[in-house]
Amino acid sequence: MTVKARMLKLLEQHENELISGEAAAAELNCTRAAIWKAVKSLREEGYTIEAGPNKGYVLRGGSRLSEEGIRLYLDHPDVPVKIYRELDSTNRAAKEAAFSGEAGHGALILARRQKSGRGRRGRSFYSPENAGLYMSIVLRPDRTLKEGLLITTAAATAVCRAVKKICGIDLGIKWVNDLYFHNKKVCGILTEAVTDFESGNIEFAVVGIGLNLYMPEDGFPEDIQETAGALFENRNDAEHINCSILVAEIVNQLLMEVETPGLSREYTENNIIPGNMIVITDGARTREAYAEAIAPDGRLVVREQDGSETLLSYGEVSVRRKSDQG
């Protein structure tokens, strides 16, 4: 572990407490000059570290995000982590890295802002700076294309677990890839895969996750104002949340869950779709049906109006409003 990583860990263990350069150097078995250099680098990554003559260093809390901080809490800290100030799309960057062979299993790409964030069915995902976490994880799972839906369900489970553990917030899952809080969408997941045509196996998958942490300063665009939400009203409400830890926990949970066969119990228990009349949108066509359950392979079991049963593996679903029900 580098001096910078060890210094970050030391500061976080004593958050809001003064640590002298001399004490830090003794603890980390390095020179005070090395401590100064590590602190300078951490500040450049966005950490608020105060210092004064003969006083020492103190790390102030806040929703900081850095490559070093994420690696510190990863179960597999050797995987590549890259944070960009701005990208068109983290999924696009991750796919390019995967195609070139640069990105192995678990490689992580984040952007503080996306210019062209994407959701399912070609939709855009609003990704302003200082409002959310926008990341893509490269996976090279031993799965067939038929099992691909379980990668998305694994990602939804991973985000729910991480948000519960780090933020203390319970999220609901809307089949197949949206997460809700207080009846507002706070997270979208987009999974894209490249497969071997002959074997039917997935060569690699890219899981894009957009998580709204705080309400944007200028609010959401008019077309999503009624449906979009965030975990916290503003940054001050999330002062206790370390974004690096949250990102690392999402990755840790995803890498663990994607290796676990089948559908997680949490995905079924936290799903808000089964047991409701729903509207299914498939292209320009819509129809109503009753959502019965989530199948073991992640598909949605619906009862059509003629009484027949259908298994959905794709499509847009929404709960039919009570005012629309006869």
State each model region's role:
Residues 58, 179-181:
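Short, active-site-adjacent cap segments at secondary-structure transitions
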